[in-house]
Curated annotation (Swiss-Prot):
Residue numbers of N6-acetyllysine PTMs: 54, 57
Protein task: Subunit 8, of the mitochondrial membrane ATP synthase complex (F(1)F(0) ATP synthase or Complex V) that produces ATP from ADP in the presence of a proton gradient across the membrane which is generated by electron transport complexes of the respiratory chain. ATP synthase complex consist of a soluble F(1) head domain - the catalytic core - and a membrane F(1) domain - the membrane proton channel. These two domains are linked by a central stalk rotating inside the F(1) region and a stationary peripheral stalk.
A single MF term (Gene Ontology): proton transmembrane transporter activity
Keywords annotated in UniProt: Acetylation, ATP synthesis, CF(0), Hydrogen ion transport, Ion transport, Membrane, Mitochondrion, Transmembrane, Transmembrane helix, Transport
Subunit structure comment from the entry: Component of the ATP synthase complex composed at least of ATP5F1A/subunit alpha, ATP5F1B/subunit beta, ATP5MC1/subunit c (homooctomer), MT-ATP6/subunit a, MT-ATP8/subunit 8, ATP5ME/subunit e, ATP5MF/subunit f, ATP5MG/subunit g, ATP5MK/subunit k, ATP5MJ/subunit j, ATP5F1C/subunit gamma, ATP5F1D/subunit delta, ATP5F1E/subunit epsilon, ATP5PF/subunit F6, ATP5PB/subunit b, ATP5PD/subunit d, ATP5PO/subunit OSCP.
Xref: Pfam families: ATP-synt_8
GO biological process, one term: proton motive force-driven ATP synthesis
Record's protein name: ATP synthase F(0) complex subunit 8
Transmembrane segments: 8-24
GN (gene name): MT-ATP8
Entry annotated with the keyword Mitochondrion: yes
Length: 67
């Protein structure tokens, strides 16, 4: 049975890792990172409600006039 030749494995593995590292560096270099993130000031927007603009009266049964 022939012996497995492993003399080139080290060169192959190192070349593969080096090429993957270079490819990843090129990918990260093309990515545009956002500039310093700044928190936006949260402004509370109030929507006009119809019940805020007019006066309403609630009639309870006890306050109704007697018949």
């Amino acid at each position: 049975m022939p012996q497995l030749d492993t003399s080139t494995w080290f060169t192959t593995i190192v070349a593969m890792i080096l090429s993957l590292f270079i490819l990843m560096q090129l990918k990260f270099h093309k990515y545009t990172y956002p500039m310093n993130p700044v928190l936006k000031a949260l402004e509370s927007t109030s929507f006009p409600c119809p019940w805020e603009t007019k006066w309403t009266k609630i009639y309870s049964p006890l306050s109704l006039p007697q018949h």
